[in-house]
Amino acid sequence: MEKPACLIVYTSMSGNTEEIANDIAKGINEAGAAVQIKDILQADPADLEAYDGILLGTYTWDDGNLPDEFLDFYEDMDTLRLQGKPAAVFGSCDSYYEHHGGAVDILIEKLTELGANIILDGLKIDLTPTAEEKEQCIQYGKSFVNDEWGPFSCFN
């Protein structure tokens, strides 16, 4: 079996979601898959169709909303065909707000509407990731690969 290729598309205002994305990518690499990371402003929604697995990351703006820089990408996703494609969503959020991590939920709903197979629960990290949460992010990346394609030995 050929090594799966995963794409992480994210946006980050404070650097927290970027840090989470990098830790998840580390886990994906450690599990034996290839991974590319793109900032939302450098990504095209059509990129999602070209990869074996996709992960979207965002912070939650205000009271549960997607940030402005994700809106065009989000709307342009409507033309995609993601039937059965493994996907997951993560983000940084603030538990102070009532709709904690609402943007993560919005993206899960969109990917589900487009036919993607959400293989992991949304990962919501409160503000800056702690050392323990960074390890959780690495494990999230490993689980994304292992839950869908099996153990690393399949790719040797």
Q: Residues of each region from the PLM?
A:
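FMN-binding flavodoxin-like domain, especially the glycine-rich phosphate-binding loop
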Residues: E2-A5, N16-E19, D23, G27-A31, ...
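Aromatic-flanked redox-active Cys/Sec active sites in thiol-based oxidoreductases
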Residues: Y10-S14
